[in-house]
Amino acid sequence: MFREALTYDDVLLVPQHSDIESRKEVNIGNWLDESRGLWFNLPIIASPMDTVCGTEMAIEIGKMGGLGIVHRYNTIEKQCEMADQIVEQIGSEKFGCAIGITDDYLERATALV
């Protein structure tokens, strides 16, 4: 049912000689969801913290091939405005929005969809 996933503790990089002549030859892309065709060239997800991922960060990391998760530490209306700005710039499949688990999570999720 669940795909195998790796965390930082599962990976060890050992320095060694390489025949690669340019870092442009390396492909670090990966599927986020192969069944939906969600491929990311940059396998980095920006944390949904107000000091990390707002509108600008979500747009820029999306342009580079990563994924930004917009924080929820504002009103539902403001988060929807942020989402609209991001969709205008990079489309709807290159970012996400945190909704939390407290009082307004259902209203927030409904408004964002």
Set out the residue ranges of the language-model regions.
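Alpha/beta enzyme core
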Residues: 2-5, 11, 53-113
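N-terminal cofactor/phosphate-binding cores enriched in small/glycine residues
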Residues: 26-71
